[in-house]
């Protein structure tokens, strides 16, 4: 029986933990698969995805900076992917790619199941308005948050995300310059790559954003998350959480879409957490 082919596409992608995660899921469930990392610059992504499909590819994950391009290339989209305008999971079906987004449910599962947070009634500050932010925003709204404030260096992108989400009384955009006047939040989510250069000053944000319940969450993990989590700890956030748990949970959702079984994420997460020092950045 031929081995089923899967991959993660990104640029860069050599750092990705997805091949190791899916290999562990395969061993756990007894499913034999070939999962590789494929580096595809944005201008070559469409052709690379077609070559993968022509070679028997059955499913793919998509990481930065290709999630919005994957949305455009998919022949059909789930409601979550359509609302997000970004795709992180592709399923091959009858010669076509179906687009899904498991980022949001991965984040919510990590926060609620692993960290025990109750998101209902919470006020959320979302930093960023690109593919990562678009992937998690709908799921946070569905989890019962009260208000989401979107802040992005490009205000037009923040406005566009708010328009896409379509809840004007609940989701608003604000300028970075307004951070000092926004009040405090129970959840602050960094969906930017601002920490990639490891600049400690990248998150020089006002301490007034934080209250006694605040959880600060970076969708990145490893070195890219250091600057934001350092700010979170200096601001005395109750929780400072990186994106490793979200990565494992969204991978499990993708695995379930492809194989019809959801693996146990706890042992995989524990093994990766033990290797935390070698982690680089988020999928």
UniProtKB/Swiss-Prot annotation:
Entry similarity comment: Belongs to the shikimate dehydrogenase family.
Any one Gene Ontology BP term: aromatic amino acid family biosynthetic process
Listed GO CC annotations: cytosol
Molecular functions per Gene Ontology: NADP binding; shikimate 3-dehydrogenase (NADP+) activity
Enzyme Commission no: 1.1.1.25
UniProt keyword annotations, A-Z: Amino-acid biosynthesis, Aromatic amino acid biosynthesis, NADP, Oxidoreductase
Protein name stated in the entry: Shikimate dehydrogenase (NADP(+))
Positions with a binding annotation for NADP(+): 79, 128-132, 223, 243
Gene designation: aroE
Disulphide bridges, residue numbers: none
Broad enzyme group: oxidoreductase
Quaternary structure, from the entry: Homodimer.
Enzyme active site: 67
Taxonomic source organism: Xanthomonas oryzae pv. oryzae (strain MAFF 311018)
InterPro entries xref list: Aminoacid_DH-like_N_sf, NAD(P)-bd_dom_sf, SDH_C, Shikimate_DH, Shikimate_DH-bd_N, Shikimate_DH_fam, Shikm_DH/Glu-tRNA_Rdtase
Recorded metabolic or biological pathway in which this protein acts: Metabolic intermediate biosynthesis; chorismate biosynthesis; chorismate from D-erythrose 4-phosphate and phosphoenolpyruvate: step 4/7
Reaction(s) catalysed (UniProt annotation): shikimate + NADP(+) = 3-dehydroshikimate + NADPH + H(+)
PANTHER family tied to this protein: BIFUNCTIONAL 3-DEHYDROQUINATE DEHYDRATASE_SHIKIMATE DEHYDROGENASE, CHLOROPLASTIC, SHIKIMATE DEHYDROGENASE
Sequence positions that bind shikimate: 16-18, 63, 88, 103
